[in-house]
């Protein structure tokens, strides 16, 4: 458990109750509980829900580190295509409850594929070797 607490950077608050933690701290505590179980697979449903940008990025970086450092397989349900683009190796895109498209991130984050998933035009820009989906225009 100490390793999981350290991994999630929760040492300063490890003796607090969950209801005393902020939203981001609570999410990290839940993920620490999963890490402590030391399973090969981690399944997370909307781990960024109700988090600000700072904490969302922090969680995604930690999850990516779990894959790299501890060889974990992580499956995440997430609605932000740019988080999926930056942090995923493989994407399964659902539309109306069925798989619309799946494949390595570089194959999914393409305008023609995303048009089929979202029924809208999405421009793709490259920033620091990462594909960013621009769909606000």
Regions found by a protein language model. Name each.
Residues 1-13:
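Conserved ABC ATPase "signature" region
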Residues 17-21, 25:
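Conserved ABC ATPase signature
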Residues 42-46:
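Catalytic Walker B motif of ABC-type/P-loop ATPase nucleotide-binding domains
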Residues 57-69:
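Helical segment within the ABC ATPase nucleotide-binding domain
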Residues 115-137:
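ABC ATPase nucleotide-binding domains
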């Amino acid at each position: 458990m100490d390793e999981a607490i350290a991994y999630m950077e929760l040492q300063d608050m490890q003796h607090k109750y969950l209801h005393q933690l902020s939203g981001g701290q609570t999410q990290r505590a839940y993920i620490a509980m999963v890490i402590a179980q030391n399973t090969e697979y981690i399944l997370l449903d909307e781990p960024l829900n109700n988090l600000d940008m700072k904490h969302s990025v922090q969680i995604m970086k930690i999850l990516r580190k779990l894959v790299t450092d501890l060889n974990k397989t992580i499956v995440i349900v997430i609605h932000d295509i740019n988080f999926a683009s930056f942090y995923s190796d493989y994407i399964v895109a659902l539309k109306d409850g069925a798989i619309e498209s799946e494949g390595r991130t570089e194959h999914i984050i393409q305008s023609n594929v995303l048009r089929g998933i979202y029924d809208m035009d999405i421009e793709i820009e490259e920033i620091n070797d990462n594909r960013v989906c621009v769909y606000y225009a």
